[in-house]
Amino acid sequence: MSMWGAVRCRLIQTRSAVRKILQQNRAFCSGSSVGIREKLLAFPGGSVELQKLQESGIAVLTVSNPPARMNAFSGCMMLELEQRVNELEIWTEGKAVIVQGAAGNFCSGSDLNAVRAIANPHDGMKMCEFMQNTLARLLRLPLISVALVEGRALGGGAELTTACDFRLMTSDAVIQFVHKHMGLVPGWGGAARLVGIIGSRNALKLLSGARKVDPDYGKQMGLVDEVLQCSSGEGKALAHAEHWIAPFIKGPAPVIQAIKKVVVSGRELSLDEALKCERSVFGTVWGGPANLEALASKPKHK
């Protein structure tokens, strides 16, 4: 077995341990979710497409629903998003995923047809639980994730941006947590993640004020990492995003994935549990091909 083959085997073994530590309950995919799955399947339309660029190690996940719906999630799209996350979790050659919307808009949340059909507390909570689980797994992927925001990211679309490690906006894009106007609060985990990103005071401002966040304000409060020098719908944003993320994914995929795993554990676990996870992940790269190559070619740091 080659050195890369050996380290991949160790990474696969560690992935199981990391998932156990992070308590990612994949059993949710059956049992309690059966009823809501059947109801979501009744609302087709749109798609969640996944393209894996093997050469760069970047995947592009595109949320697509006709322009009139501004890429709102139909029921079937929610199920499809979960399937795409499943695929990304086992992509051993991957380094990053860019989440974008089609046709110059990011996402406007849930399709109103599906929302009206499950407008009762029981179904609403089941849908909430399903999407919380999916977006939590998206954020925990062993890939560096970037939300590429063109046009508008509204409601659940704004929540989707918080399920990525970084957020990039085109110069004319807007993020808005409009839940208050619908008589709601975020239900896909967006509030909890938003507090972690910008703090409770700023999160309270955005949620209670339903304020439109333009790129400058977003960067000022720490929600946005970079403002791209292009406009929505020009067809240039994805190339800009790939260029922006390139320095962060330079190197072998096993090392990039290992870095993401220890950051996730440090963010979500107690110190003792995070240290245990760090030791486990460290063991997958210590003495691995990248480590040995670096020791041979770089005897001293400069």
Swiss-Prot record:
UniProt subcellular location? Cytoplasm, Cytosol
Q: What domain of life is recorded for the organism? A: Eukaryota
Q: Which InterPro entries match?
A: ClpP/crotonase-like_dom_sf (IPR029045), Enoyl-CoA_hyd/isom_CS (IPR018376), Enoyl-CoA_hydra/iso (IPR001753)
Q: Which UniProt keywords apply?
A: Cytoplasm, Lyase
Entries under SUPFAM superfamilies matching the protein: ClpP/crotonase (SSF52096)
- Which Gene Ontology biological process is one annotated for this entry? fatty acid beta-oxidation
What is the official name of this protein in its record?
Ethylmalonyl-CoA decarboxylase
**Gene that encodes the chain:** echdc1
